[in-house]
Amino acid sequence: MSRILDNEIMGDEELVERTLRPQYLREYIGQDKVKDQLQIFIEAAKMRDEALDHVLLFGPPGLGKTTMAFVIANELGVNLKQTSGPVIEKAGDLVAILNELEPGDVLFIDEIHRLPMSVEEVLYSAMEDFYIDIMIGAGEGSRSVHLELPPFTLIGATTRAGMLSNPLRARFGITGHMEYYAHADLTEIVERTADIFEMEITHEAASELALRSRGTPRIANRLLKRVRDFAQIVGNGVIDDVITDKALTMLDVDHEGLDYVDQKILRTMIEMYGGGPVGLGTLSVNIAEERETVEDMYEPYLIQKGFIMRTRSGRMATAKAYEHLGYEYNEK
């Protein structure tokens, strides 16, 4: 069973996100620093009648990297071709995609850190000089074919920017760090979603829901749907702060946006290792989760909220973690 606070896409959420997706930067809520920079770069590229420099968007899942890619294409007035790193298994797959691009088009590669090295190497000349050299045939009869490409913009999205090779990262002229959303922005997103789907919600309820959504629109919209169900069956259909608190408590989402897995991580650190330091591998084994899952899905939010510290010796639970879970904290 998937956890309610998982920031990866579940079920029909891709369709829901497409329905909610803003079309232009002025409609995009939050990520102001990234938006302000992109607005300038896009306008400058349009004035020069050039393709926008390649863009790298990085940050945790669910923060709107795919949405931002579509917004950029709309702002440029060009087509967007969408694919992902795991889908492009060999260089020929990438060549076929590049060959379909029109001048100025956007190629969006999600999970770009998962591109095979053989594919990544083809991208170098395509990104830098808009051409590719490919080998046709095999053995002594093989020959190199030079293909010119129209100017295009590559938008890469990744949750693990550190896994990108230096040569690939260096070819992105624009980088955008997608951060967890501020409470006010997330509240506005919840209210916008409720309005689009004709849900009746109070501002206080939207604010409480945003507070417990881990700074992530995808999670906020998912929780909103579950709270709506609760309001429909237990209440009178109106989503207010009382209904919201009851629903989220039933879903094991506390007032800091932590669920049972987050609390299990913190309790394990405190009860078994005296608050740490404890290695990530050891911690993962103790809570029966994959190391990569803990590192990518749980830890970033716990660090951002000040419940965990990274040290050279390992992870440590903070005084805030002790206080939140009701433990007495003795500073080491």
UniProtKB/Swiss-Prot annotation:
- Region feature (Large ATPase domain (RuvB-L)): 1-181
How is this protein annotated for GO cellular component? cytoplasm; Holliday junction resolvase complex
**Residues covered by region (Small ATPAse domain (RuvB-S)):** 182-252
The EC number(s) attached to this protein equal: 3.6.4.-
Task: Tell me which residues bind DNA.
Answer: 291, 310, 312, 315
Alphabetical list of InterPro entries matching this protein: AAA+_ATPase, AAA_lid_4, DNA_helicase_Holl-junc_RuvB, P-loop_NTPase, RuvB-like_N, RuvB_C, WH-like_DNA-bd_sf, WH_DNA-bd_sf
Major location (coarse): cytoplasm
What is the enzyme's main class? hydrolase
Q: Does the keyword rRNA-binding apply?
A: no
In this chain, the stretch annotated as Head domain (RuvB-H) covers 255-332
Keywords associated with the record: ATP-binding, Cytoplasm, DNA damage, DNA recombination, DNA repair, DNA-binding, Hydrolase, Nucleotide-binding
SMART domains this protein is in? AAA
Any GO molecular function: ATP hydrolysis activity
Positions annotated to bind ATP = 20-21, 62, 65-67, 128-130, 171, 181, 218
What is this enzyme's catalytic activity, as reactions?
ATP + H2O = ADP + phosphate + H(+)
Q: Which family does it belong to?
A: Belongs to the RuvB family.
How does the record comment on the protein's domains?
Has 3 domains, the large (RuvB-L) and small ATPase (RuvB-S) domains and the C-terminal head (RuvB-H) domain. The head domain binds DNA, while the ATPase domains jointly bind ATP, ADP or are empty depending on the state of the subunit in the translocation cycle. During a single DNA translocation step the structure of each domain remains the same, but their relative positions change.
The record describes the protein's role as: The RuvA-RuvB-RuvC complex processes Holliday junction (HJ) DNA during genetic recombination and DNA repair, while the RuvA-RuvB complex plays an important role in the rescue of blocked DNA replication forks via replication fork reversal (RFR). RuvA specifically binds to HJ cruciform DNA, conferring on it an open structure. The RuvB hexamer acts as an ATP-dependent pump, pulling dsDNA into and through the RuvAB complex. RuvB forms 2 homohexamers on either side of HJ DNA bound by 1 or 2 RuvA tetramers; 4 subunits per hexamer contact DNA at a time.
Could you describe the subunit structure of this protein?
Homohexamer. Forms an RuvA(8)-RuvB(12)-Holliday junction (HJ) complex. HJ DNA is sandwiched between 2 RuvA tetramers; dsDNA enters through RuvA and exits via RuvB. An RuvB hexamer assembles on each DNA strand where it exits the tetramer. Each RuvB hexamer is contacted by two RuvA subunits (via domain III) on 2 adjacent RuvB subunits; this complex drives branch migration. In the full resolvosome a probable DNA-RuvA(4)-RuvB(12)-RuvC(2) complex forms which resolves the HJ.
Question: What protein does this entry describe?
Answer: Holliday junction branch migration complex subunit RuvB
